[in-house]
């Protein structure tokens, strides 16, 4: 039964999402319908949590605008999401970054992982798997 549910859910899951984790800064392009027009609105912020699995999987993005913190929850299987871009990779040691809610400005910064570090780690893990 579980395999059947998982197979049905796979049909509804989007396949064009990039790989991102908690702590990454993402830019989410959302389709917004206003009367008879449809436009794309961009929401950029830090992923503070990823929750759930299957079609119920969601991620929460937090940004600060004019000194006010704004959080928005996006389902992975949402047809109104046009695309998701990862702008920065963050290095965090927590699965949920709720502590960012109390922090403002520079205190809310997250250490960034550079692209060459990501490639180096991928090569090292690939080499380790080949040696086993």
Curated annotation (Swiss-Prot):
GO terms for biological process: translation. The keyword Ribonucleoprotein applies. GO terms for cellular component: cytosolic large ribosomal subunit. It holds the Pfam family Ribosomal_L19. The keyword Ribonucleoprotein applies. InterPro entries: Ribosomal_bL19, Ribosomal_bL19_CS, Ribosomal_bL19_sf, Translation_prot_SH3-like_sf. GO terms for molecular function: structural constituent of ribosome. Keywords: Ribonucleoprotein, Ribosomal protein. Belongs to the bacterial ribosomal protein bL19 family. This protein is located at the 30S-50S ribosomal subunit interface and may play a role in the structure and function of the aminoacyl-tRNA binding site. This is Large ribosomal subunit protein bL19. It comes from Persephonella marina (strain DSM 14350 / EX-H1). The gene is rplS.
